[in-house]
Amino acid sequence: MPLQNVKVADEGTVNFQKVKEECITAVESLHKVVACYRHLVLTIGGSSDSIHLRDELRRTRERAQELAVCNRNKLTTALRDKKLSKKDCEELERLWVEFSSCLELFHNDMCKVYELATALPHSSTNQPAIQTGSTGNTSAIASRALNVQNINYSDSPANKASLEYQEIEEEILKVDNMITDMEMKVNVLRWTVEANTRMNDELKSTHDSSSVVLLSEEESNSKGCCSDGQLIVSLLLCGTALVAITLYSIL
């Protein structure tokens, strides 16, 4: 093979590895932000609900949307490259499935936030909707989501409920359109994408480890039973010997 062709192939491999690492980092960042958003959703209507929580939800939601756009652009460009090998294409398709699944979960959580915010509007007095006697701070959770990359946000919370509902509706529509646009640009059939590890192997390893634990427990239990049985036999022999000695002394 000519030296020039080898050099071009090496450059193509390096470029793909760089693109793949960027896509993996972007997908992992989106996973973290969506997980933090889901955790914040659970506190709506509880004792930790406040204006600051609603603002944290809004900022985390905006951060997740920015990461989603970044993910979509990177993966779409990479998957539409006709020079990809079959192996490289399979790796990107797995990342695509992870990204699209995470985006669907985020869309469901946004719809849940809209329904909960409509059913449990926050009062102007900043009082919790449910008085449980326990309180908690959610700023640490939101900070983990917002610190994935440095972005400046306004610290002023949204004061009008109607404006908040309108913003959530618009953001839900954006994510919905993004999912539709992704399916039209890149046709990746999820049921054709294979995982890195086989589920049977994972189940087998889990079954083997559980079997070892059960066997060790059974052995310990059997040893305990043997010890108890030996003790009972010893007591019976001692009692028989004492009775025999007593009868012999009487006779």
Curated annotation (Swiss-Prot):
Residues 251 are extracellular. Residues 1-230 are cytoplasmic. It is found in: Membrane. One of its GO terms (biological process) is G protein-coupled receptor signaling pathway. Disulfide bonds: none annotated. Its main location: membrane. It is a single-pass type IV membrane protein. InterPro entries: RGS7BP/RGS9BP. Keywords: Coiled coil, Membrane, Signal transduction inhibitor, Transmembrane, Transmembrane helix. Residues 53-94, 158-187 form a coiled coil. GO terms for cellular component: membrane; neuron projection. It comes from the Eukaryota. The chain crosses the membrane at residues 231-250. Belongs to the RGS7BP/RGS9BP family. Regulator of G protein-coupled receptor (GPCR) signaling. Probably acts by regulating the activity of some 'R7' family protein (RGS6, RGS7, RGS9 and/or RGS11). PANTHER family: R-SEVEN BINDING PROTEIN (R7BP) HOMOLOG (PTHR21029). This is Regulator of G-protein signaling 9-binding protein C. It comes from Xenopus laevis.
